[in-house]
């Protein structure tokens, strides 16, 4: 991954305005491998990278991939901008008929231990699997859509809620929730107990309004003060971000509702946010932009991760197998659900293949079915993602 200084200075304090350089030294006379990793997120169009001494090193270039390629033809761009599942999902909306479909089991058989989740999912049809891979219409006070929604199998509609500074419910609903300080201000406390208390209170409000998945915390790094979503993010420091946002996750999930850590990853620009390319060296990606995510995944086990709109070194984050499978699952051991951000430009079947389990705010069942018929996605890939989605639902009270 490159050259580093042989010496690092350590500062100790309670804030950036109150730090002291530690009067301490430690000499290591031999190399020690603390963790061995494989090449992931390799740059394709990054001409150089900065070394620890401030000099630059040239990087090899490769031919960029066609991010719009699809085995079933390019998607209509109008379908990637705010199409609500309430409009698209009417033919797929499920109403219970009182019996498990085709005489098979329902989800309560899994809950009560009569069959395993693997056995239950194996009984679902291809159309059933595809249905579960996409977002579902709002119910109750929700306005960011939900997951599940297959009553004939006993699978409920489980609703999400946005809100970087409190649980967001539309004003016309007539329900008020607490407006907490934004993430940047909370991070200025340097106090995990405060963040955990905010998360616990927000999780309680989520639960009392029959919502199950809070689309927070957002933990991308403050790379530039001009990023339009900096107020949602915590800090320019990965360690501060990981510790404090981790406490937020811990507080939220103490209510048996889910936190959604986002935007995974390197989402540092709002202009052209769905097609911008975050070009970064592997070392910078791991040590700066992915570190807070790694800390939270390993320490707090968030129920969900949200992939980001942007590309990373030429690949859409939501279609990046390196990111969503190689790093997140294989290296960090994550076992939860990954959802896309709402209406990404990624192709649904390609996202599923990469490890992005859920397409929000709606799925594209016709396109996934077409991809399946052409052999571009397998039943096994769909089952893997559906088990993660249902696994989240099964955690709820």
Where are these regions (language model features)?
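Glycoside hydrolase catalytic-domain context in secreted enzymes
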Residues: 1-2, 8-12, 16-18, 39-397
